[in-house]
Amino acid sequence: IGKAANTVTNSPSSITLNTSARTATFTVNRKGNGTITATSNNTSVAKIKSINQSTGVVTVESVNDTTGTAKITVKVAEGTNYKAASDTTVSVTAQFVTIYGVEWDWTSGGSTRGKRTDAAASFGDPSPAVNNGSGSSPFDGKMPWSGMVKETRAGGVEVKEPKYWFKWTKTGKKLKLQIADGPVAGFSVDPVNRDRGDGLGELDYSYIGRYHCASGYKSATGAAQQVNITRSQARSGIHNLGANFWQMDFAQFWYVNMLFLVEFADWNGERIGRGCSTSNSKMNNGQTDAMGYHTGTTAASRDSYGFTQYRNIEGWWDNVYDWMDGCYYNNNGLNVISNPNNFSDSANGTLVGTPSSGYPSDFTIPTA
């Protein structure tokens, strides 16, 4: 008498790993006593911890809390009374990181507004403060946004910049930006906290001044801003505060702006307010100190000129012009300098693109 055919099913056919369940199980339902083996096709995400040959229970465990997917292939060998069974699979989803995104579709237009994606898909619009009042945002309590808190340090009042991971994707006329609160395959560490070749390595957080630099090049409230200076003067003056103090640069610019883009799903900064001095002349730092929320305008209306702040950074656009380091133009186009030790007005940069005239209508994603 020959051996009978075997039929195998797995219950459940998909499992999830996360911070609440770093291991998960499924049961292999088979006929007879054929030996069960199981292998993962992505051992950087999930691996087999154990197999109980009596009960058919397979235990799968996370690998270093890595977010991603894997497929477990189950094999049942020939047993005493049954033939070897056909392979079956179980899907594994490991979610230890939250991803927030926004996508713009410029196929038939050029709107500044985008559509929220990923974990932000169901979020409503933030409500920044008006007239120094209160405000709210669905991103409050979500890292890295919630980590942008004020601290008094050697450079004055500064705002903490926690590390995040990001990814730009371009498909035809669609542009997508995603920000994650942990490492994800295919994502990059933010421009400020990544290893910039300056000897500090990858950082967990950095800082940016809450205010424009005042006397002594520090970030101080109630003080007048440094104006009518060159970029190189600002560079040296700020760097004199300490070995790791640098003028706001191209990396800082994009660190903050990417957070804004995902939070507001809009390229229009005036969603917060019109940033401009109310008197057509500069006014001292600290105009937003009385604001009851980290983001908003001092004006009675968002359509009126006042003083603005975003995530505790005052004057991201208003009152005075800013120098930005770490970039320069030459005949070839825009050059970017990653290592702050190499900041220069005309050298040491990597060419990232050639701008065209007029307002931007599309973007490319540089690979440099």
Q: Across the structure, where does each feature detected by a protein language model lie?
A:
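Solvent-exposed, low-complexity, repeat-rich "mucin-like" stalks and linkers
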Residues: 1-40, 93-96
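Low-complexity "stalk/linker" and mucin-like segments enriched in Ser/Thr/Pro/Ala/Gly
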Residues: 41-58
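Short aromatic-cysteine micro-motif
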Residues: 153-155, 181-316
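Short, conserved beta-strand/loop elements in beta-sheet-dominated catalytic cores
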Residues: 163-165, 243-248, 252-254, 291-368
